[in-house]
């Protein structure tokens, strides 16, 4: 699935690790910029604190009562962080940064396998330096841990899908990712990975896709992963008097899928239809500043101009089912769509690593320029909003937050200058990432 060899800089494992570490440090520096302001941050942090205080690592609790909202993996990790750093906001958020760093490195490995090392490198930078991941990578939320586990399974499948014969190695990594994703956020991880595997296998040519026996092996490994999850879930449900099943699965999984909860989503069928495409603007804002690449990427992937068929199929099988699943769910929150972001980042990386194709195809060049001007307009509006916050709220914003948003403006301008000068999308993308860092 790799593209043909290219001349010029080809980032390796060392460069990818250094970039992942740099973004991780950047996210850690952002953490003290604000107190725990999201309601979920306070819930999760308190549940982790109570685990430490009570020694009950089986059943999460909040204010002494069963807290059946989510499985325990993130609470376990937060509790470990509290034991090292003390009970404070930084400790509550700490786990998210390295988890996001792991996601970035795995995205590089996936992009390297599907397209080229430079495509993978741009993809990891695009993922790590978009608005949504900057927020979730510096917040006491569960999403960064979930994303890392999803990316682990996706990377293992990318290697197997590309013909790697080390089935038991990558099959084991696939199962570990599935198990961790379930311990992080229940069935969300498998709901992303299973369609990715199914569609990219079914629609691949029979001569190039993994053998059917390997698919049976992955199914058995997934059952083992489910068994690992049940090894926690069954005792926890018994200890909670059935609350983990009734509330955790019945309300917070099945209930959220079919009914808008806590005002997150439209009420009634009219409200449901009105909110159906809410994730389109969420992606446009959340993937900023890399939304500049999406019009050209979607056009290039749809027309078969970027990457080979296997690579495009892999990305489509990740992006489309994930987007459709969260779109159809009744309850909608912006961070729910995060599992689709690595696929978007892979598209961005593939575009940035294919300057010859983009500049040769007038339609792709047009869409890239369109994305740029939308990017500039949104950047200016965002910077204006950030600068206006002190006047509107009466509170000063932390310097890391202000610097991060200011850097986005410089980054967008740096990228477009390189594109307009036809100096190469890869060089421009690196200028953007450097300015943002």
Regions found by a protein language model. Give the residues of each.
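Transmembrane-helix motifs of polytopic, lipid-linked glycan transferases
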Residues: 94-114, 152
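Short acidic/glycine- and proline-prone juxtamembrane loop motifs at membrane-interface regions
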Residues: 138-146
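Transmembrane-helix signature of polytopic, membrane-embedded enzymes
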Residues: 13-19, 107-129
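Extracytosolic helix-loop segments that constitute the early lumenal/periplasmic catalytic or substrate-binding loops
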Residues: 25-26, 43-66, 73, 80, ...
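Transmembrane-lumen/periplasm boundary regions of multi-pass, lipid-linked membrane glycan transferases
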Residues: 46-49, 176, 180, 189-335, ...
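Start-transfer (signal-anchor) and selected internal transmembrane alpha helices
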Residues: 1-27, 217-224
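Specific aromatic-rich, kink-prone transmembrane helix
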Residues: 106, 145-163, 344-347
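Membrane-interface transmembrane helices that cradle and orient dolichyl/undecaprenyl
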Residues: 118, 153-173, 181, 352-355
């Amino acid at each position: 699935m790799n593209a043909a060899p290219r001349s010029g800089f080809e980032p390796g494992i060392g460069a990818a690790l250094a970039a992942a570490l740099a973004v991780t440090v950047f996210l850690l520096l952002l953490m003290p910029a604000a107190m725990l302001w999201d309601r979920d941050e306070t819930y999760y942090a308190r549940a982790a604190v109570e685990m430490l205080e009570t020694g009950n690592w089986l059943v999460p609790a909040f204010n002494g009562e069963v807290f059946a909202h989510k499985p325990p993996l993130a609470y376990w990790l937060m509790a470990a962080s509290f034991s090292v750093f003390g009970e404070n906001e930084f400790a509550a958020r700490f786990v998210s940064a390295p988890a996001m760093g792991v996601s970035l490195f795995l995205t590089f490995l996936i992009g390297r396998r599907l397209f080229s090392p430079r495509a993978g490198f741009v993809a990891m930078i695009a993922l790590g330096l978009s608005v949504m991941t900057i927020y979730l990578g510096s917040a006491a939320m569960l999403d960064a841990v979930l994303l890392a586990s999803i990316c682990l399974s996706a990377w293992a499948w990318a290697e197997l899908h590309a013909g790697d014969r080390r089935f038991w190695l990558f099959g084991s990594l696939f199962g570990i990712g599935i198990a961790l994703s379930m311990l992080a956020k229940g069935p969300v991880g498998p709901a992303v990975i299973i369609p990715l595997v199914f569609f990219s296998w079914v629609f691949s040519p029979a001569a190039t896709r993994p053998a059917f026996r390997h698919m049976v092996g992955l199914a058995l490994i997934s059952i083992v992963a489910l068994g690992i999850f049940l090894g926690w879930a069954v005792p926890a449900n018994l200890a909670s008097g059935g609350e983990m099943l009734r509330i955790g699965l019945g309300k917070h999984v099945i209930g959220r899928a079919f009914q808008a909860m806590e005002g997150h989503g439209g009420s009634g069928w009219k409200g449901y239809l009105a909110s159906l495409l809410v994730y389109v603007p969420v992606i446009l804002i959340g993937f900023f500043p890399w939304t500049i690449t999406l019009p050209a990427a979607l056009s290039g992937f749809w027309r078969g101009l970027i990457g080979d068929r296997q690579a495009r199929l892999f990305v489509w099988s990740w992006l489309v089912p994930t987007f459709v699943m969260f779109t159809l769910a009744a309850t909608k929150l912006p961070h729910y769509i995060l599992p689709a972001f690595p696929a978007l980042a892979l598209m961005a990386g593939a575009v940035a690593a294919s300057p010859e194709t983009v500049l040769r195809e007038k339609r792709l060049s047009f869409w890239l320029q369109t994305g740029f001007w939308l990017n500039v307009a949104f950047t200016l509006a965002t910077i204006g909003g950030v600068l206006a916050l002190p006047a509107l709220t009466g509170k000063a914003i932390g310097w890391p937050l202000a610097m991060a948003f200011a850097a986005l403006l410089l980054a967008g301008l740096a990228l477009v200058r390189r594109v307009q000068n036809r100096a190469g999308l890869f060089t421009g993308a690196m200028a953007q990432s450097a300015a943002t860092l």
